[in-house]
Amino acid sequence: MLLLAGQAVRSFEASAQALVLNLVGVRADALGQAVIFPLQGRWVGVAFSLGCSVAPLTALFLAGSAAAAWMRPLSYRSVLIGVGALALVFMVANQLRIATIVAMMRTMGFERGYEVSHIFLGSAISTIGFVAAVVLFVRLVLREPTVRTPGAL
């Protein structure tokens, strides 16, 4: 479903990024699956391609979680919470990555800023976000359910 709605997810990501940039004082707009902003007197943009979207990774974990929940006794609630948290961390990391690319382009110029931030900083942010999301996901999905005793706070 996420992969089929990939275009809508990428449009949402671009709109969210435009909102984030505007909140920190950078004039920006979403245009389809891209966020655009003025740079050196002209409008430029960063596109959310399929590889730059949270949809494929989230879909992969959703499918894996469904298979795992079917094969072993996992709480569906824990799986849903885990996938939701995973998607949220992926989204935050991706928004931070794109904001970093925009900031570096504004600081270093279009070509050099994109090159440095997309390859080096963007990859580092994505890797840290991925690891954090997976660790959180595993902890949430595999945690022992809490049992409440009557009258306990």
Residue ranges of predicted features:
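Hydrophobic N-terminal alpha-helices or hydrophobic patches in metabolic proteins across all domains
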Residues: M1-L153
